[in-house]
Amino acid sequence: KTRTKDKYRVVYTDHQRLELEKEFHYSRYITIRRKSELAANLGLTERQVKIWFQNRRAKERKVNKKKQQQQQQQQQQPMPPTQLPLPLDGTPTPSGHPGSLCPTNAGLLGTPSPVPVKEEFLP
């Protein structure tokens, strides 16, 4: 016999979710003893508490994986021109000179064109 007829979705109350989250924050893995205490206090079965913890750990793994992927994508993207470092004295160097930190399109158009610098970086 399959369990599909018996299955139903448990909707937890705000209080139940809060208590389960508090317990999860304390420990990601619940002990047998604490599981039975929590189930009795919240009016849930031990099986429901166990499944909630399994699902919560899966959710945490999913969120952490997504965060890690976002961080990797940010590290792979080049720095925007407005965030390029300036010389130590804080003044922009003229474009086109050797050692200049400001990118230029002088080689393409024939005339130097400095990158705009945010006001907070100007002397």
UniProtKB/Swiss-Prot annotation:
Similarity comment text for this entry: Belongs to the Caudal homeobox family.
Expression across tissues: Intestinal epithelium.
PANTHER family: HOMEOBOX PROTEIN CDX (PTHR24332), HOMEOBOX PROTEIN CDX-1 (PTHR24332:SF16)
A GO cellular component entry from the record: nucleus
Molecular function (Gene Ontology), one example: RNA polymerase II cis-regulatory region sequence-specific DNA binding
DNA-binding region: 5-64
Region (Interaction with 5-mCpG DNA): 47-58
Superkingdom of the organism of origin: Eukaryota
Region named Disordered: 57-123
Gene: Cdx1
GO terms under biological process: anterior/posterior pattern specification; bone morphogenesis; pattern specification process; positive regulation of transcription by RNA polymerase II; regulation of somitogenesis
Protein name, UniProt field: Homeobox protein CDX-1
Basic residues composition-biased segments: 57-68
Protein's job: Plays a role in transcriptional regulation. Involved in activated KRAS-mediated transcriptional activation of PRKD1 in colorectal cancer (CRC) cells. Binds to the PRKD1 promoter in colorectal cancer (CRC) cells. Could play a role in the terminal differentiation of the intestine. Binds preferentially to methylated DNA.
Places the protein is found: Nucleus
Alphabetical keyword list: Activator, Developmental protein, DNA-binding, Homeobox, Nucleus, Transcription, Transcription regulation
Positions of the UniProt region annotated as Interaction with DNA: 8-29
Predominant subcellular localization, coarse grouping: nucleus
